[in-house]
UniProtKB/Swiss-Prot annotation:
Organism: Zygosaccharomyces rouxii (strain ATCC 2623 / CBS 732 / NBRC 1130 / NCYC 568 / NRRL Y-229)
UniProt KW Cell membrane keyword: yes
GO cellular component, one term: plasma membrane
Segments of skewed composition (Basic and acidic residues): 221-239, 259-270, 712-722, 735-763, 814-835
Biological classification of the source: Eukaryota, Fungi, Dikarya, Ascomycota, Saccharomycotina
Protein name (database record): Eisosome protein 1
InterPro entries for this protein: Eisosome1 (IPR024527)
GO biological process, one term: eisosome assembly
Positions of disulphide bridges: none
Family: Belongs to the EIS1 family.
Matching Pfam families: Eisosome1 (PF12757)
Amino acid sequence: MSLVSTVNDAERTDLLNSSGNRNGPVVETVTTTAVEEKPITTKSVRGFSVYHKGGGAQLSKEALYRAKVKYGIYQSPARSFSTGVAEPKVASDVAANLANDNKTTIEAYKRLFVDPNANTAARRSIVNGGPRVEDVVIPESHYGSHQAATRAYSVASVATDENARRLQSPQSPPATRAHSLKSANKAFYNTKLPEQVEVVPKQVGKKPMDMSKILSSAENRAQHRVTDRWDPVKADHGIRTSTQNLNRVRSTSLTGPIYKERKGVKEPSSKDASATQGDRGNYAQWAAFAVRDMDPTALTNKEFEERERAKRELLSQITSQQVLAKARENADKQLDAIDANDVHRVLFGNDAYNRAAIEIAQRNAQRQAGETDVNEGKINIGGGLWLSPDDVHTIAREMVDPVLGEVHQRADDQRATDVDIKERNDYVTNEWNAWTAMHQTKENNNEALLVNSQNKRTREADSARSEAEKSFTELCDRMDKQVAERNDLLNQTKQAREQLERETEEKLAQNKEDNKTALRDLKGQHAKELEEAREEQRRLVQPYEERLEEVNREHESLVQERTAINEEIARLHESIKEHQYQISKYEREIKSHEEQNASAEEELKKLETDREGIQSHYNDNVVVNANKAKEQALLSSEEARLQNLKVDAIINERKTELNRTEQELQREKLNMLEAMRKTAEARGDENIDEERVKQLIGMTSTEYVEEQKKLQKAAGKAEKPKASTADKGQALDKALAHDQGDQEANTKDFKEGAETKAKESKGKPSQSVAKAIATSPTKTEAKAEPSTSKGKSNGVGTHPDNASGISQISDTLENGKHLSEEDLKELAEDAEQRVSGEPQPSYFKEVF
């Protein structure tokens, strides 16, 4: 039986307020505190209907569950710690006994807080005094158990008393009367804690409670429970692990390689195995040591692991249906063979064999029935020992009687204890009734005191109200007189204010008329001054606007000029590409003529009669060189013109930027003058601040206007002789076209003259041709000639006529000397280098 509860107050209140705990038995207890001779009697109501359903009944399932939840006891194999008791259902009893022996634990169950209603109870106790109840002394031997039992009974008392108060006054707070009284008495009498006061135990009741046997029984059960937990009995319902079983396991195909390693180990005998199995005390310890000392790497053989790994790899590679079908067939055959070798199936499946066995068994049974049995009516207990039922009953009675005697003794003790508890409960009930009557009397006195106090306060309030009304009436009369005086003064003040308002309105109307007249005159004067200032401003701004328009026109002309220059540059780029293509073409022709010249020289050594044909080839080579020189001259001239145009474009861009800057400057000046004009208008001045303008611009506005007029006149005079860059570009294109026509004519005349002279000099030696090549114009000279002609066409010089060019070639051919082959080769190489060389700097100087 549980005598103590360790649940907190909130859980206990919720538990006892439930519907199942409202009908518990009522038990009254008396708790005495020896402090200043002021004992305290409390009412306790037991409501443990869940734990005890009747006299001598066992704990219910709900009570057992709550006890397990309370103490953390769960019947689960996963929990390895012990609860300290033999059976979970007696955990509450064991906990109560332990709490009785442990003084520190007892203090943990006591209420050490002050109830919220302690203040009210203390105030009431001051009037009526504390309760006068005879002290009840508790024996020292039963002081702990008495406190534990009282504590257990007080749990139900709280719930029952609280439910009763709820039924009487639903709006009252949840605090109980017992708690309030106890807290009030402690607060009023300055009660100390129980551990600080020495309690003198005295005998209570007729017979003291002897719990020695109960405690000894609980200790024995707890020891038995701990032993079962530390040394559990292993339940083995299968095959014993004996030598025969080891041999049977060793014979299997899978574990054979593992047990080969244990051939040298001595196998235990069946007797030793039985002894080992019988020693259950060291089972858990051996299992723990085995787990601690287990090496996972030494469980299996390395060769067996390799073989199993190879087997798994082989099985993973078998994916063919034929292989699987063959495997199934082999497995079926093996199963059939196993079924055929099953002795039990063959034995009990043979009908003839079974019939013969039944007949033999019947004959043996009939023969044994005819024989006399010596041990008839006895029980075979094994080992050839037969006992009669009387002997068995005698042995059982001798073994059970001591236990039953102890049980009967404990039952008698428990009954005596229950009787003692009942007597004590009756005594406490009587004491409680007396205390309740006394407390009722005290409450009646308190209520009477409250009624008297209320009547006294009512009389005092009536007298105070009459005094206040009298004072208020006097105050109202005095205030009415003051209000009348204030009203008279207010009327006089209103009359004075009306007179002042009339005078002020007349003055205000006169001031408005005067202000309107002055405002009209001022507006006319300001309009006239504003018109004059605007005229002056327009006169000052006019030069800036004209200058701005002029700069815009100049900017547009420069933009057009730049566009024309860009178009001319693009055209010259295309012309340069065309000339470069012609030069590469002529270079290819020169290479082909050089190859023909080399072959012609070889043929010239063999055939003297073909001199005329070879001479014509040399003449063609000269013409090609002349054309190449012409194209290079045109290319150089166009590159020079391109450079000039680029320079002009850069100059044009700079001029454009300068004009743009000038425009920004003119705009800023105009904005500045406009701002100064607006400032002057805002101030009401007729003219702008000339000193400020001179400080900012460097001159006055009048001087600035005169200077702008002079600049406009000078710009008009300069526009007449000025020619645009586009017209210059067109004149230059015409000059280049004229020069190109002159060069083509000179080339044609030169070619015809060379052919004529070649026919005339047919009979002369071939060395004259080499001399002509040596004396022919080089690349630099060929470039110089067209550049000179170009310069003359532009006013620098004139082109050489065709007659002079032909005479020059003919003189070269006629004056040619006989040269050796080595000299001819050197002259040819020199001519090639000159033709393929870069133009000389002097040529570019003449061009630029």
